[in-house]
From Swiss-Prot:
PANTHER family: THREONINE--TRNA LIGASE, CHLOROPLASTIC_MITOCHONDRIAL 2, THREONINE-TRNA LIGASE. Binds 1 zinc ion per subunit. It is an enzyme of class 6 (ligase). NCBIfam families: thrS. InterPro entries: aa-tRNA-synt_IIb, aa-tRNA-synth_II, aa-tRNA-synth_II/BPL/LPL, Anticodon-bd, Anticodon-bd_dom_sf, Beta-grasp_dom_sf, TGS, TGS-like. Its EC number is 6.1.1.3. Residues 1-64 form the TGS domain. This is Threonine--tRNA ligase. GO terms for molecular function: ATP binding; metal ion binding; threonine-tRNA ligase activity; tRNA binding. It comes from the Bacteria. It is found in: Cytoplasm. Pfam families: HGTP_anticodon, TGS, tRNA-synt_2b, tRNA_SAD.
Length: 667
């Protein structure tokens, strides 16, 4: 070992330290206050314990305010939770406890599973352990010692974990006071640095190693943050998300349901299907005059999926089918035993449509769009309302173009995607370019050209938006068949949703032998661009329901108006009002029940009807209406004609309004 190490600091300065120097000693050499605030170091980008001896490299001192400290806080909190559990319930075995998005969990082997009532007790003991401020210390054990110690403690799951660690790999044991655990680390300096901005969230069951053949363990989920304010904000978002849960709102608004016989497929009710159709009609209008809408078969022979490559790399997510007779009589050689698959994607079908008939460079680009029903197998535990289903509709499109047309087509697609999102009220949008992964098809030269074009497109997107649209690069995250743009939206409560994609494909046209005739009368492979805006229409509707908390814009509401009467002698006028609104194109229902008007208003507010028109004797005599808005205590009285004009204008979709305004300007 050399006598000195050389460390480069973030400001570019370089300092020498004796060999064997720890991260803590480096922090102390800068200032005592920094050493006090330090929780770890990052050496060449890798976070490490303060107590580790370090070597040459680029060093950063990580404090609690550093974003990288959050994972340490959560990791340490998981260890403290495990210690608290074993103090409260001796004999409980600890298994694994990773950091996850927004928190952590730990799985325990306990005779009686935890209940929600146990969580406050565990939290209280965790705070006591944190207050003890015991240092985290690390030891390296041999495999034999680790197995012997854990076996003596009755920690059979830890023994199994030790056996699974590859030979020759160090076994790290982290202590916090007398309590210890098998762990890769790193950890902060002491339990006191965790702070008290944590909360245990829920208990659940989990099979050991995720295998239903293994024992059921008891899992505790928690969350931890650097500050109480961050914790409070997170809990507020969770509470808001629960209120906005599209599954609950779907029931309350009578939009859809799921049932056992059709796991992961949606039963759309009348109102929900109207909303689905409104989205489809809107998207159709946006594609008119630009795309050819096509429809490819839902069931295709296995051979096509073998050619496309899906049968090889996507088979576990596909549904394969035979005729019912072939299924029940697999040995019947006279029966048609061909294997078909429900399409998981629309792209192979679109290549077949492009290939049908000779294409000239003069016809390029060819833009094909489909609202295609696709089916993908998802594990039952992964299904989640409209957000994760097995059968869904993609607003899919594929552009076949020349390499020279690629940039213009990507920009055209981008403009359409951003315009759609803005029509639905999303203003915070991030566009990221995913570049070549290690495993890929196509030459480096082809990737160089494609990425160069897409980088220029990304730059143009940011410039044209005046910086309003944020952009970024995701190195190595592209598909094996080409680079792609990913579009992420931020909703009303700050959650991010990845929706749209624009993906260049060098692979599929080659697999299917697609070509066009170029200017030199030569066969040339087209560039294929996959494009989705909503992605899954079902998921996008789920996002919209949660974003608006069910309070949909009038143009998109599944039921726009309820006409409710105060007394039966206003029913005839109520029918007239409802019919006039229907003739104007509004979605209207009536409520002439013998109930108090406030009861009716409350009931329809629960189902998120945007507009309730109240008609009584006075309104009937004066031919007026009383308008009540969802979420507002205000009431507006106006003539029936004014109400129809106002509501129809408000219920006009934004794209239609733009066209009407453009026509008006030309007149």
């Amino acid at each position: 070992m050399s006598e000195a190490i050389s460390l480069t600091f973030p400001d570019g300065s370089v300092r020498s330290y004796p060999a064997g120097t720890t991260g803590r000693e480096v922090a102390e050499s800068i200032s005592k206050s920094l050493a006090k605030k330090a929780v770890a170091i990052a050496l060449d980008g890798t976070v490490r314990d303060l107590s580790e001896t370090i070597t040459d490299g680029k060093i950063e001192i990580v404090t609690r305010e550093d974003g990288r400290a959050l994972e340490l806080i959560r990791h340490d909190a998981a260890h403290v939770m495990a210690e608290a559990v074993q103090e409260l319930w001796p004999g409980t075995q600890v298994t694994i406890g990773p950091v996850i998005e927004n928190g952590f969990y730990y799985d325990f082997a306990k005779n009686e599973p935890f209940t929600p009532e146990d969580l406050p007790k565990i939290e209280k003991r965790m705070k006591e352990i944190i207050q003890r401020n015991k240092p985290f210390t690390r030891e390296i054990w041999s495999r034999e010692k680790a197995k012997e110690v854990f076996a003596a403690k009755g920690e059979n799951y830890k023994v199994e974990l030790v056996d699974a660690i590859p030979e020759g790999q160090d076994l790290k044991i982290y202590y916090q006071g007398d309590w210890f655990d098998l762990c890769r680390g790193p950890h902060m300096a002491s339990t006191g640095q965790i702070g008290t901005a944590f909360k245990l969230m829920k208990v659940a069951g989990a099979y050991w190693r995720g295998d239903s053949n293994n024992a059921m363990l008891s899992r505790i989920y928690g969350t931890a943050w650097a500050t109480q304010e961050e914790l409070d904000n997170y809990l507020h978002v969770l509470a808001e998300a629960e209120k906005r849960d599209h599954r609950r709102l779907g029931r309350e608004m009578d939009l859809f349901h799921f049932q056992e016989e059709g796991p992961g497929v949606v039963f759309w009710h009348g109102k929900g299907w109207r909303m689905f159709q409104t989205l489809t009609a809107y998207m159709r209008r946006r594609l008119a005059n630009t795309y050819q809408e096509v429809n490819a078969p839902q069931v295709l022979d296995k051979s096509l999926w073998e050619t496309s490559g899906h049968w090889g790399w996507y088979q576990e997510n596909m549904f394969a089918v035979k005729s019912a007779h072939a299924f029940t009589h697999p040995d019947d050689k006279e029966a048609d035993q061909r294997v078909f698959a429900l399409k998981p994607m629309n792209c192979p079908g679109h290549v077949q449509i492009f290939k049908h008939g000779l294409k000239s460079y003069r016809e390029m680009p060819v833009r094909l769009a489909e609202f295609g029903n696709v089916h993908r197998y998802e594990a039952s535990g992964a299904l989640h309302g409209l957000m994760r289903v097995r059968g869904f509709t993609q607003d899919d499109a594929h552009v076949f173009c020349t390499e020279e047309q690629m940039a213009a087509e990507c920009l055209r697609i981008n403009d359409l995607i951003l315009s759609v999102y803005e029509d639905f009220g999303f203003s915070e949008i991030v566009v990221k370019l995913s570049t070549r992964p290690e495993k890929r098809v196509g030459s480096d030269d082809l990737w160089d050209r494609a990425e160069s074009v897409m980088l220029e497109v990304l730059k143009t997107i940011e410039e044209q938006s005046g910086g309003r649209i944020k952009t970024g690069i995701l190195p190595g995250e592209g598909a094996f068949y080409g680079p792609k743009f990913e579009y992420t939206l931020k909703d009303a409560i700050g959650r991010e949703w990845q929706c749209g994609t624009t993906q260049v494909d060098f692979n599929l046209p080659e697999r299917f032998g697609a070509f066009y005739i170029d200017q030199n009368s030569e066969k040339t492979q087209p560039v294929m661009i996959h494009r989705a805006i909503c992605g899954s229409m079902e998921r996008f509707l789920g996002i919209l329901i949660e974003n608006f908390a069910g309070h949909m814009p009038l143009w998109f509401a599944p039921l726009q108006v309820v006409v409710a009467t105060i007394t039966s002698d206003a029913d005839d006028y109520g029918r007239e009002v409802a019919e006039a609104l229907r003739e104007a194109g509004m979605a209207v229902e009536t409520d002439f029940r013998n109930e108090k008007i406030n009861y009716k208003v409350r009931e329809h507010s629960v189902t998120k009807v945007p507009v309730i028109i109240v008609c009584g004797r006075k309104e009937a005599e004066e031919r007026t209406v009383n308008i009540r808005r969802l979420g507002s205590q205000n009431q507006t009285s106006m003539s029936l004609e004014e109400a129809i004009t106002s509501l129809v204008d408000e219920a006009t979709p934004p794209d239609v309004k733009r066209k009407l305004a453009a026509k008006k300007q030309l007149a």
